[in-house]
Amino acid sequence: MYKLRYKEDDAIEVGLDEAGRGCLFGRLYVGAVVFSNEYEDFFDHGAMLKDIKDSKLLSKRKRDILYDYVQECALDKAVAYSEASEVDELNVLQADLTCMHRALDALTVPIERVIVDGDHWRPYKDVEGHAIVDGDAQYLAIAAAGILAKVSRDRWVAEQVAAHPEWDTNYGLGTNMGYGTAVHMKGLTDHGVTAEHRRSFAPVRVALGLPLKEKFQKGKKRGWIGVEDAT
């Protein structure tokens, strides 16, 4: 069962989660969600926000429904993103951390605690912060933030595909959302890269004929960021 709060107190707590960190294509998104401390506030039009869970475990339809619930019922919420060019400039971890701060800056309530999915956190002002491995499977606000980030990113990818139908034909972006599926990898080989591909990621560098970083040259498969199935 998901926990409502990290600590049983009255501090204003925000959950953070990202979407698209492992993608070869496009923006990285971060969602931020603050829920009321009152349990009764987790009901809206007969639907429980307790239905929220890790966005990867939800169907697209369910994510869209819960996205609307979070937008309506959260005490505060925000979505921020880093462009592919910023991911390349900073590296994906630093872009993620920068985007977290960007999302926090967009909130209007005075937050007192941050909980974030993962094992990295960059201190924000004088606010208490906690990085929690698998936090999106434990805390409601983190899972809700992941839903905002995932739906926002998927909608952005859909806009890109609508503007460039050949990107779906060539890379399967309408289905894989930028992750390194077999169809996407073959598209890089057959058609090269688009302006939205992340040039710091190994498969994209291979397609461009650019040298790989040392960890990729050693053949460490885990270093091939973005080579995973889309969810």
Ranges and model annotations:
Residues M1-T231:
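RNase H-like, Mg2+-dependent phosphodiesterase core
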